[in-house]
Structures are given as C-alpha cells and as structure tokens.
Amino acid sequence: SLILSVGRLTDAKDYPNLLKALLELPERYKLVIIGEGEARNEVERTILNYGLEKRVKLLGSIANVATYYSACDIYVSSSKWEGFGLVVAEAMSCQRLVVATNAGGVAEVVGDMNYIVPVSDPQLLANKINEVMEFDHETKMEVMYRNREFVLKM
C-alpha cells in the first residue's frame, strides 16, 4: 500500500508525526514524500532513527506531481498548521483517498470529518490510515469519486 505526502519539508508539515504513524502500520505500507525544505536533514535522521529506510522514499522536488497522486493508494497530510490545503485538494481532484490532520483550512477542503484526525497524534493518524485502507473496493471507489466531485464544486 502506497502512502503519498506532498509538501515542503518544514516543521509545519510535521513529517515526524507521519513517520511515527508509519511505525504503527503493517510493513506493507510504504511512504513517498515529495518536497524539499529546511527540515530535510531532520526528516532523514528520523527515518534512520525509526529504521524506516526501506519503507520511505524522499523524492525531493518534482514538477508533475499528478502522476504520483494517481499512483498512490492514499494521500496523507500530517501538518501541525496549514493554510488552505491546496495539495489535499489536488489529491482529491485525482480521486484519491485522503486522511489529514485538522490543521488550518484542511478540514474544509476534505469536507468530511470522518477523514480528519487531531494534529500531532501519530496513533490516531495510523488508525485512520489503516481504517480507510481496509475499506472494501466499492467503498473506496465511492469515497474517491466523492472526493473529486467535492473539490470540483469548490
């Protein structure tokens, strides 16, 4: 199962929270992070400290992120604070499952509090990712379609 997260590598995006959540998830979960920033060294250190180097890929900055949205099973935003949540809207417009922390305007973008968890709670984040990934195929398709429709109406 492929988890995608896109955003600058900064304290605000709280990647350590997402990495800690990944520790709670089964081995089959892999994480790809797209973005560059001043917290890259901290993120790399955290990956090594948690022994996640086989499960996490840092891809740096990438121009066309849409193909990555389409390739992932779920998009996760683990921010402590956030503005509008544009990348969440992009993921939803690509018909992806989305789980996000309740930071800034993200909850409004997602539009369904069932997919929102409190900030800085890796256990709840992991539980929600697992819950959504365990949906049956039909439910996943329904949610992904609804995500796209919701964003297109914004």
Give the location of each predicted region.
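A conserved mid-protein helix/loop that constitutes part of the nucleotide-sugar donor-binding site
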Residues: S1-E24, E38-E44, Q123
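Nucleotide-activated donor-binding/catalytic signature segment of Leloir-type glycosyltransferases, i.e.
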Residues: E44-G60
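Aromatic "clamp/platform" in nucleotide-sugar-dependent glycosyltransferases that forms part
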Residues: S61, K80
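A short alpha->beta transition loop at the rim of the catalytic pocket in nucleotide-sugar-dependent
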Residues: A66, D73, Q95
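Short acidic/histidine- and often glycine-rich active-site loop of Leloir-type glycosyltransferases
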Residues: A89-E90, A103-I116
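Short hydrophobic beta-strand element within catalytic cores of glycosyltransferases
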Residues: L97-A100
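Conserved acidic donor-binding segment of nucleotide-sugar-dependent glycosyltransferases
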Residues: N114-Q123, E131-H137
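A charged, aromatic-enriched C-terminal amphipathic alpha-helix characteristic of glycosyltransferases
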Residues: H137-M154
